[in-house]
Amino acid sequence: GYERLTINEGFVARYHNNKISISSITSYQYLDDCMTLDQDFSPRSMFTMQQMQKEHTLTEEIVIRNANPLQRWQWISGAFLFGKWLDMSSPVKFKRDGIEGLILHNTNTNIGNVFPGYGLDIPNDSFVIHSEFNIPTYGAALYHQSDIRLGRWNLTAGVRIDLEYTSMDYN
């Protein structure tokens, strides 16, 4: 099955005079979802995985541009920042057919070759292997573009600098 909750919100503020126009765009997104999959895709009761994630994303962009569209030199400059915080859990649940067919059969076949007469037993009908992830991502960008009209010609030049950082903690 699959369940999802998403919340999005944004805010825009603008300032304008006869020389410049400034705008600020702020957004927030919250995501909470849960997906359960039969990982072996067979009629046997092998194992399932459940992936649950909660994500918060915050962005901010500030844009400054000249306000007179009739000027020969048109320009735009801006800054963009974002942060994303993702917490994800992906537990895998081994069921009886998976324990016997994937784990015990393979393990006991190989243990018997090295230690004759010994083997492994898992009496449980199921067990869970937990996987927890924390994945923050941050980014920033600065940009500028200039357009100069030269008669019938239009000269455009721009530059953008992007920085991004991400990490992952796994338990």
Name what the model sees in each region:
Residues 1-76, 82-87:
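Outer-membrane beta-barrel domain signature, strongest for Gram-negative TonB-dependent receptors
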Residues 76, 81-171:
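Signature of Gram-negative outer-membrane beta-barrel scaffolds
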